[in-house]
A protein has these predicted regions:
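Conserved N-terminal entry element of GNAT/NAT acetyltransferase domains
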Residues: 1-7
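A generic local structural motif
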Residues: 4, 24, 57-59
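Structural motif
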Residues: 10-12, 32
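A short, structured beta-strand/loop element
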Residues: 17-46
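A generic "binding-loop/recognition-motif" signal
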Residues: 23, 77-78
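Conserved acetyl-CoA-binding loop-helix of GNAT-fold acetyltransferases
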Residues: 49-62
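Conserved GNAT acetyl-CoA-binding A-motif
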Residues: 62-77
Length: 82
């Protein structure tokens, strides 16, 4: 099901990743104290067209919330989600 996606936190590249087939979406971040700044959003058009944008961003927000970190969205796409 489309809502059941698994994201990965690639700490080395400082980005959350979502792989679907040969496509990868990513949200880059920067950590500062107990805040995470979501700075850049990239998603292949194929995934956007399939409705993965909101699902991916929500999954990232859920992951960050579970860690007890404040989210500071700076990417226009992430801000638009709110």
């Amino acid at each position: 099901m489309i809502e059941d996606v698994e994201i990965t936190d690639n700490e080395f590249l400082r980005q959350f990743e979502l792989e679907i087939g040969d496509n990868m979406a990513r949200i880059e971040y920067a950590l500062q104290d107990r805040k995470i700044f979501l700075t850049k959003y990239e998603m292949p058009e194929d995934l956007e067209d399939q409705g993965f944008r909101d699902i991916f961003i929500k999954a990232v927000f859920d992951e960050v919330r579970d860690r007890g970190i404040s989210v500071m969205p700076t990417s226009p796409e992430v801000v638009g989600f709110l």
